[in-house]
Every structure is written in C-alpha cells, then in structure tokens.
Amino acid sequence: MITLTTLSTAHPADVFVQAANHLLRQQAPAMHNGQPAIHALDGRTDAAGCFITPEQFKQRHIPRNALWSDLVRRKQVTSAHKDLIIKLNCVHDDMVYQEERRWRTLDLRVVLSHLRAALGPQCMWVQVYEEGFRRIGGPC
C-alpha cells in the first residue's frame, strides 16, 4: 500500500489518488489486491494519525518533498506502520493560500519522480498513469 499525504488542506491528492488507483487496478492487480492501493491523508497528521499543526511540522525541519523513510532514518518522525508514505509539500508556496487555485499546487513531476524512486521496479504503471492523470484533468 502507498499512502500519499499533502502538507496543505488542498485536495490535489484526491485527483491523484483517483487516477492512480484507477490505473493500478488495470496495470498492477496483484499490488492492488482489490483495495485502494493509494490513500490520501491530511498532511497534518503524523505516522500514527495524530494531529500535527503546521507550526509543529515546520519545527521538525522536514524538507519539502521528503520521503517518509528518509525522515524515519533521520529520526525526525517515527513510523507506526510499514506503509510507504510519501510526504509531498506544495511546490508553489505563493499559491498555497489561494483557495480557488489550490488544486494546482502539486507538481506532478515531483510526485512521479518520488514514486519512481520509491517503487523501483514496481513503477511500470507510473508512465501509464501520466497520460491517465491528464485525461482526468489534474495539474501537469
């Protein structure tokens, strides 16, 4: 299972999750196993699902677009489960608080590069997903 989290209250992850799960059903049924393989969580929760404020998050000095495994290794966070968690920050900080444009704040290239690095040989669906994401209408 992959858990995608964003660090804003925006909903770009919802579109991402919709597209990725749709393609996972087609391209990697064994990995999908009948359940959603990717879940979007509020980025202001820690690994155990405990609420964390933006201020607390900044105090942990978590780098933008950091892989959760890297943060665990640096002891900046603790892992409550074995899910692969990818922490993604909005890459256009000046747009984060523009409500009507929040869905555009996730850089698809950053998402895909992290997924490729994290999934390794299992990333064959990512290339297929790129076109699917465009068709669903997410940011490119």
What do these predicted ranges mean?
Residues 2-45, 52-140:
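Domain-length accessory/inserted modules outside core catalytic folds
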